[in-house]
Design a protein with these regions (language model features):
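Short solvent-exposed beta->alpha transition segments
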Residues: 5-13, 19-73
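Hydrophobic/aromatic beta-strand elements that line small-molecule binding cavities or substrate pockets
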Residues: 58-62, 90-95
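N-terminal Sec signal peptide cleavage junction
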Residues: 1-3
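Solvent-exposed coil/turn segments that connect beta secondary-structure elements
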Residues: 67, 75-79, 92, 96-100, ...
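Low-complexity, intrinsically disordered terminal/linker segments enriched in charged
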Residues: 89, 103-140
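Short, cysteine-centered beta-strand-loop-beta hairpins and adjacent loop/turn segments enriched
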Residues: 78-87
Length: 140
C-alpha cells in the first residue's frame, strides 16, 4: 500500500487529537498543535475531567482547502459534573501541514452551548416547585 494522501493524514490527525483529548490526554495531544496555540489549547481544556466531562466527540465534517490546509468540524457532547444536562458544542478547527506533520493551528466554537472550553457560565438553580401530589385526607 502506498503512502497516505494529505487528506487521509489530516483526517487521521484530527481524529487522534480529538479522541485522545476526550479521554484525558490533553498534555499528550498538545504536541499536535502549533506552538503558537499550544498554551491556549491546554488552558481551554484545563477543566476536562474535573468540572467538564466530555461524553462523546464526532468529526462532523472535513474539507481540504488545499494540499496543506484542512478545516474540520468537531461535535462535542459534554456535561458539567455539577449538572447532569447533556450539552452539545460544534467546534471549527483549522489544520495545517506546511512543515511536517499535521498541526491544529486554530479552533473556535461555531455553535452550541458555551462552557466546554472553560468559559464562565452562571450556575443554573431551579426555582422551588410546588408539591405535585394530591393533598392527603384522613378518613376516620
Amino acid at each position: 500500500m502506498g503512502p497516505q494522501s494529505p487528506a487521509s493524514r489530516a483526517s487521521e490527525a484530527a481524529r487522534e487529537l480529538n479522541v485522545n483529548s476526550r479521554f484525558g490526554d490533553v498534555a499528550g495531544t498538545a504536541t499536535m498543535t502549533s506552538p503558537n496555540v499550544r498554551a491556549q489549547y491546554v488552558s481551554r481544556r484545563a477543566e476536562w475531567g474535573k468540572l467538564v466531562r466530555v461524553v462523546d466527540v464526532d468529526l462532523g465534517g472535513f474539507q481540504m482547502t488545499d494540499s496543506e490546509h484542512a478545516t474540520v468540524i468537531v461535535d462535542f457532547q459534554w456535561t458539567r459534573v455539577d449538572d447532569g444536562t447533556l450539552r452539545n458544542t460544534r467546534v471549527l478547527q483549522e489544520w495545517a501541514s506546511t512543515e511536517g506533520p499535521w498541526m491544529l493551528v486554530r479552533e473556535r466554537r461555531q455553535s452550541g452551548d458555551i462552557g466546554l472550553f472553560g468559559e464562565v457560565i452562571a450556575p443554573t438553580t431551579a426555582a422551588p416547585r410546588p408539591d405535585v401530589q394530591f393533598p392527603t385526607r384522613v378518613i376516620n
